[in-house]
């Protein structure tokens, strides 16, 4: 087992500073080798703090070159074990070390063998598995811990079903996967006392395969009750009885120690219960700490259970979805004296498809990434009841791409013809079946809106809906109804149907269908089908040629409007003014030609497929998969035609059109989005549903619901605003620098960096800084990292390859740290306690004026800035502010680095939108003392 400490992450730039190797057999350590290494360069201060290795220690150590012979002799040809070992080997490979040694990665092994772990860092695994780990990030201790972890994982592998091990070994044999030998060794150990037959027979005998030789589930299909049958006349809720449960001394205080009675929570519960009883719609703004989830879940559960009704609860974020389904609802189920069922339903691509998994298993010659994902799935499969991707650790884009090959996908689904669905082993349809019998159905906004788009074919019929995080609803509807296309995507759709590779020679789905039909149809019928197929193939080639003309014309037209040398994507609205220019004429002609050819392909496919469906005397079962794919490709091309024809030739009044020139490769994409969302929400949600509750901590702008009401057409909804129970005057200091320039003035960035640095040093890190652009974020990160590093403060930065979840985890668990984020970090961040004591808002979060959707919608107002831009920014500002105080004991500082809150006519509206808190104005130089005094007071 080996571990290195290094001066940085890039082997080409940085060097090893300490190395430790442990030789072991089983649980016995045979020998150790350890040495500090002189990196022959400066060790960054942050790395010194992380590893505990000082510059003086490293300068007095031998060079790695002088240690090579000793290290090579010690390790010999033994297999090497390490946690994320490829990182260590990349440094050692520069010196020709260990090129021929087998390498076993305990990080990869743990992610396969322990699928239900929350995190896979060496220290977290050691803690969860009871392995005594010493000081983190000292190579001596990490190497010993890794050796012990490997033995624990080896023992875990031996406890797997032998058939699972054999299947992983069989699949790995045809790949270059480093862990194949590990599973071969485990199989050999397990098989010593077992008489083995063929792999297929073993899998069949152990229930891993079904009679078709396909992987199947390891659990019996659960017995479920029939779908709910709503009561003819709903029984009203007893509002007073429900409210009493939340009173001091009520059911909640008896069941949950530490429960606090909150009048705001009771008031919200009464409003929600009233909406259920009166079948009215409701807008509820409930400040942080109200406990709004219990305030709506309690009446929802009682109403649904009493009346055998479905109540759908929709959230915007996965975090809230998980909180509701895995914590709040189970708490209610334990507390309440009634039985009610809940289901969590996600988009279908979150569910494993066993038929597609089987197809991937049979492919052969699998890459190491594919093998890694297959091993994870095969180990996880016996324990899952849901087939939900969230239960499998897939950290890389490559692994998530492999999931895309095995997940449930409408383009590959055989529906009722699928054997797995017939046997009750389709995870997606089983999830839908559970939803049909559930009283509470938890979904996200995307699935809620997708159900509307497909005319309610995803969710069971329901009349009661609660939308949490409702401030995101307009954006969610916009995303759901938006369209995007580029040349590559359109060409791939056409190519999947057919592509001419030589005169008279084609490949693609149509060619496969022709070959598949030959033995199934008589000569005459096959000749007719082949002729129809050839007609469609020719239409595809015609569409392909005009596709090139279209995008060449677009490039020529848009080149006159692009700004050269920009490092970001440029979005250009396709307005009437743009279309009136002479250069657009060529685009319109090419667009007309392409969409007409595209319509010809769609019609040709329709006639071909209808003709084959009418051949009732022929058994075309063996062609079902090809026919299904052609149906779906035809449907996608039809949708593309329906969007592109108006975009290019016949624009519609209520649609926004734009083109994006992508900075990375300069390719062009075309986009559409709805101009007015409120009319759609009114038509498809408010009108058909009996009751809808929309709730969030931020629904009001400038003290009024007018903005959100107008955006969502929630004209008839009752409005309830509840303040937070938190004591903001005592817990929150709002500091407004008096000597910082406005954002568009010289020296603003320099002064903002200075203020942020002073605050972080005074607070010892513990700071979340929110930005409105990646450009400012990265400029700030470069400016402050060194200074804060010298103060032993770590800086975590969004957009540098680390996931949002990992950034938050690093921030929570690193005592002296700062997190710089934009976009998604303005909401959904929930860090309680001293880990987050300071919040910095770099700029007021106005939308980018050139954003096509923002610009087009702004034009519908008499005063776009005051009526649209300001209210929208205020809601975002309030969301950001809400990241600081998450509990009654939290205490902290909000620093706003945008002087416009005090100098512009609209600035006071931003301040007035916040809870009443302590405000200090003063020069930046006073900030450190003010911060220390405020934070030292304690809660």
Where are these regions (language model features)?
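Conserved non-catalytic scaffold segment of RNase H-like nuclease domains
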Residues: 1-102, 115-137
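Acidic, Mg2+-coordinating catalytic module of metal-dependent nucleases/exonucleases
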Residues: 79-95, 117, 121-189, 894
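Acidic two-metal-ion nuclease catalytic site recognized across multiple nuclease folds
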Residues: 151-238, 927
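A substrate-engagement module of RecA-like helicase motors
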Residues: 223-232, 239-250, 308-439, 508-534, ...
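Conserved pre-motif I regulatory segment
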Residues: 236-284
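Signature of the SF2 helicase/ATPase Hel1-core->accessory helical subdomain module
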Residues: 296, 322, 412-440, 444-596, ...
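A contiguous, basic/glycine-rich beta-loop/short-helix subdomain that forms a polymer-engagement track
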Residues: 404-439, 449-456, 598-740, 747-754, ...
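Conserved RecA-like P-loop NTPase helicase motor core
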Residues: 737-747, 799-904
